[in-house]
Amino acid sequence: MSAVLKDPIPAPGRPESTRPEPRPGVLAIEAYVPGKSHAPGVEKVFKLSSNETPLGPSEKAVAAFAEAGRKLEDYPDGSATVLRQAIATAYGLDPARIICGAGSDEILNLVAHTYVGPGDEVIFSEHGFLVYKIATLASGGTPVVARERDLTADVDAILALVTPRTRLVFLANPNNPTGTYLPFDEVRRLHAGLPANVLLVLDAAYAEYVRRNDYETGLELALTADNVLMSRTFSKIHGLAALRIGWAVGPAHVIDAMNRVRGPFNMNTPALLAGAAAIADAAHVEKAVAHNARWLPWLTEQIEGLGLKVTPSVANFLLIHFPDTPGRTAKEADAFLMKRGLVLRQVASYGLPHALRMTVGTEEANHLVVAALADFMSGNSSAGQEAGGKDK
């Protein structure tokens, strides 16, 4: 007996369409735009737009990556066993409390997909990482933005926004793109003020760079509380951004729930092995910390000496503020620097249209940026068209 074909009936609440349509809300999401990598027409480019380490990855990680390339026909370990064990060894953790993902971006998206749905609310600070909003909307939730104080997360402002619909609070500590941080007493106060059914997600992507006595990553809180997850990344100090490696630690019930949503082979073998080698190379990490400790204050002092404001940073980048004056704006500065092969990050999408974010670079790049900004602020646009090119 042949089947009877019927005209399709539009889903309730959706208009008839002649093509597949995404579910409501998807097209309202502003796609993430990464930092630029190129400067058109410039011979030598210094990418200072994405907060990557200027020292590159550990040689041990590079060797592990190369070795992994000898056996690409096999599926990766879906449980990321070798990487979770390496992380556990480095931090004295139970590997069962660790989940790994393709960058901390995947971790943040996983936690949103696991705990957030239509009608739920997610709180984050007004200049917080853009992925928080994207992950919330992609899960069908409602973003709730807390005002900051002096470009720093405000615990009281966050707690004032908590409602019975709140499911998650994202806190970047240190924060990107401002470089500011909350002392851990404030983080504890935030946690103490949250209902037990609200998950606090501490995004500590830049934790290794912080050298402040009142700072903690949140690791201990993630191990002892039932509603705290701490996420980390290999993209910054470990120099493995191209491999997309992130991880998180938290309560067993949270990790179990996230693993049920996680894809079965969400990380590739080269990433797993390179990440395991990188986290075991403490000497390489210390070199990166020392480089940043040398150049972050130097850049801050030099740039402030040009009459520009720099938000005090504890990370591996600076937020540079420009006047809203024709010829001196952040957008014009970005174009000026780009012509010299110096690629910084515009942060208007973060609600900071008058600022640029600069990664701490190599010694050469740092000096070139300061020299270029000096020319820009003085109106000397003809001095050296390229940072390292033929026109200099």
Curated annotation (Swiss-Prot):
Which InterPro entries did the record assign?
Aminotransferase_I/II_large (IPR004839), HisP_aminotrans (IPR005861), HistidinolP_aminotransfase (IPR050106), PyrdxlP-dep_Trfase (IPR015424), PyrdxlP-dep_Trfase_major (IPR015421), PyrdxlP-dep_Trfase_small (IPR015422)
**Gene Ontology molecular function:** histidinol-phosphate transaminase activity; pyridoxal phosphate binding
> Which cofactor is essential here?
pyridoxal 5'-phosphate
- The segments labelled Disordered in the record are 1-24
A Gene Ontology BP annotation from the UniProt entry: L-histidine biosynthetic process
* EC class (word): transferase
Q: Which residues carry this modification: N6-(pyridoxal phosphate)lysine?
A: 236
Report whether NAD shows up as a keyword of the record: no
The entry's keywords: Amino-acid biosynthesis, Aminotransferase, Histidine biosynthesis, Pyridoxal phosphate, Transferase
Q: Does the keyword Amino-acid biosynthesis apply?
A: yes
Q: Which reaction does it catalyse?
A: L-histidinol phosphate + 2-oxoglutarate = 3-(imidazol-4-yl)-2-oxopropyl phosphate + L-glutamate
Pathway in which this enzyme or protein is active? Amino-acid biosynthesis; L-histidine biosynthesis; L-histidine from 5-phospho-alpha-D-ribose 1-diphosphate: step 7/9
Annotated EC: 2.6.1.9
Superkingdom, natural source: Bacteria
Family according to the record: Belongs to the class-II pyridoxal-phosphate-dependent aminotransferase family. Histidinol-phosphate aminotransferase subfamily.
Quaternary structure? Homodimer.
Among NCBIfam families, the record links this protein to: hisC (TIGR01141)
* Protein name per the record: Histidinol-phosphate aminotransferase
Its gene is hisC
